[in-house]
Amino acid sequence: MTLSASFANVRSTTLSLCQTLEPEDFVVQSMPDVSPAIWHLAHTTWFFEQFLLLPYQPDYRVFDEQFHYLFNSYYYSAGSMHPRPRRGLLSRPVVSEIFRYRDHVDEAMTKLILSHGDRPEVEERVGLGLNHEQQHQELLLTDIKHVFSCHPNLHAVNPGLLEPPERTAPEMKFAAHPGGVFEIGAQGDGFCFDNETPRHETLVQPFAVASRLVTNGEYLEFIQDNGYGNHALWLSDGWAAVQQNGWNRPLYW
């Protein structure tokens, strides 16, 4: 996939995650660790504007100078920023303006990639920006789910996924591994998280890993079997958290 195609794919995927949201859903901040959906859309756009368009596109026109303060996160070298716990108090810019902001930056980025995408430093920064946005896609979904979990009617993020799949999970088996010194971390040009680089050696103790993921049906069995009340099923720190927070079920389903 070309760099231009990768850019378009990642940017459109972010928007697709928001397609079931109403305008009112975009601005809610349900706790300090949650960012409103509109902030994610703006911040990932600001990243491309700040670290690619401004240094590499001399004729680029900044969409709004105030966005630099509003949508910086923790990039202290880039300047000051609006406090994270107060992001939900920003009723302006409105949602439609942030979508225009994304269009503005996408158009400029497309031109930049076509004209300078073969420069190693530009290609590297575009890749970094795409990985950054893909990380925010996960955060975006996590934050939307938390916002909806606070509503007494428990709205679904994607109502189309409410029907259970017409299949059963294969038997879960565990494969034992002896452990040892392994080289871990990202390699190649694919997606990775920030903490997956640089690639390095580390000691891994002997372990066993399941052949598949846990299903929500199995998790329901754990709840019904008093899994949250049985200390033998938890590590000491986990059990302390269960007791301290009064957990008896997942935060949302």
Provide a role label for each language-model segment.
Residues 2, 6, 15-21, 25, ...:
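Extended beta-strand/loop cores of jelly-roll/beta-sandwich
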